[in-house]
């Protein structure tokens, strides 16, 4: 009993790496290997690091705002203009306090995104799609492998960040217990530093998870854009044309070129032969041409065909083995013969013209 295996079954399996065209097309659709956790982690880390530098500025601005609010704003007469002035002043002060952090977060987010995918804008991502409203597909997305991975990632982030924060608190356990004994300024300074260390620890832990997530996203992306052998064949046909059709076109072009070449053989003045392997058809008109040029050439069966046509049309054939081989190798069809061959060709053409005069 013979077991027959249909190889077409395996042709549909996506086992091949994506072609450059497939990668380009998916990129245009906004499908790239990217982890949003990297943007979040980098932004948080840069924000907390920048607080080391701009923290004193923010503290001074905040204390100045509080002082002004309690010394001046609370004593102002309640009126529409004063409320408006107070509201504008509040927005201005809050903007001055938060602007550096917001700017740092924006720059960090843009840079981290650029490092992952480069410059990319795809309108297709923001286009509304009715398939997203399909409850069946929505249900499948909820219980898909990607959803499970996202759930695991969320749990890991909570656990890791929680552990990092707990570790910082545990390391400063004694100092936390002494907080009631500190002055307000000392307590504020300690809490600020503690918050900063917790933020840096949490952001660092998130960055490690984000790096792992990026590797997973890249692996998942490569898996999703894999192609089957049939996909690659179809893509090649669309971009380059069907190989069978292209080969037929090339064959037709060769046949047409061959036909045109053979039509020029009767017009030749002489055929230089090897005598059996090479045949070179030359034409020369001293009134129109500076040098003889080749109208046809060939080897073996093609040389035989050229000699046959030449014989049918009484075109003289001259045997010169080295010249025939040299002309075949160095000169193309419809190309003038180089100067180095002028002397020997002049002798051959003179012999041909002299022979024709005797005949006629």
Swiss-Prot record:
> Which top-rank group of organisms is this from?
Bacteria
- Main subcellular localization, coarse class? membrane
Offer one Pfam family short name for this entry: Bac_export_2
Single GO cellular component term: plasma membrane
Give a GO biological-process term.
Answer: bacterial-type flagellum assembly
Where is this gene product found?
A: Cell membrane
Q: InterPro entries recorded for this chain?
A: FlhB, T3SS_substrate_exporter, T3SS_substrate_exporter_C
- What are the record keywords, sorted? Bacterial flagellum biogenesis, Bacterial flagellum protein export, Cell membrane, Membrane, Protein transport, Transmembrane, Transmembrane helix, Transport
The residue ranges crossing the membrane are 38-58, 94-114, 151-171, 196-216
Topological relation to the membrane, as annotated: Multi-pass membrane protein
According to its UniProt record, which protein family does this protein belong to?
Belongs to the type III secretion exporter family.
Protein's job: May be involved in the export of flagellum proteins.
Please report the name of this protein according to its UniProt entry: Flagellar biosynthetic protein FlhB
């Amino acid at each position: 009993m013979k077991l027959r295996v249909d190889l077409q079954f395996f042709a549909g399996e996506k086992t091949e790496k994506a072609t450059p065209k497939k990668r380009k097309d998916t990129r245009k659709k906004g499908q790239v290997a990217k982890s949003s956790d990297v943007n979040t982690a980098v932004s948080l880390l840069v924000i907390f690091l920048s607080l080391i530098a701009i923290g004193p500025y923010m503290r001074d601005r905040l204390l100045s705002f509080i002082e002004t609010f309690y010394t001046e704003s609370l004593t102002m007469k309640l009126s529409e203009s004063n409320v408006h002035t107070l509201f504008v002043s509040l927005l201005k002060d809050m903007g001055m306090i938060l602007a550096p952090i917001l700017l740092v977060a924006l720059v960090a987010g843009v840079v981290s995104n650029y490092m992952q995918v480069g410059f990319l804008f795809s309108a297709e991502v923001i286009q509304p799609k009715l398939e997203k409203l399909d409850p069946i597909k929505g249900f499948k997305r909820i219980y898909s492998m990607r959803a499970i991975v996202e759930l695991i990632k969320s749990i890991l982030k909570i656990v890791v960040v929680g552990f990092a924060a707990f570790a910082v608190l545990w390391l400063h356990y004694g100092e936390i217990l002494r907080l009631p004994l500190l002055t307000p300024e000392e307590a504020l300074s300690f809490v600020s530093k503690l918050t900063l260390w917790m933020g840096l620890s949490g952001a660092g832990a998130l960055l490690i998870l984000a790096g792992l997530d990026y590797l997973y996203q890249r692996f998942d992306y490569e898996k999703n854009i894999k192609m089957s052998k049939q996909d690659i064949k179809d893509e090649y046909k669309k971009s380059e044309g069907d190989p069978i059709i292209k080969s037929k076109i090339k064959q037709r072009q060769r046949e047409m070129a061959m036909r045109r070449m053979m039509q020029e053989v009767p017009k030749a003045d002489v055929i230089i032969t090897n005598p059996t392997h090479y045949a070179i058809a030359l034409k020369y008109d001293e009134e129109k041409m500076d040098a003889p040029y080749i109208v046809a050439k060939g080897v073996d069966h093609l040389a035989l065909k050229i000699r046959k046509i030449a014989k049918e049309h009484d075109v003289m054939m001259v045997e010169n083995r080295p010249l025939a081989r040299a002309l075949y190798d160095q000169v193309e069809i419809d190309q003038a013969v180089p100067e180095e061959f002028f002397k020997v060709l002049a002798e051959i053409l003179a012999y041909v013209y002299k022979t024709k005069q005797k005949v006629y």
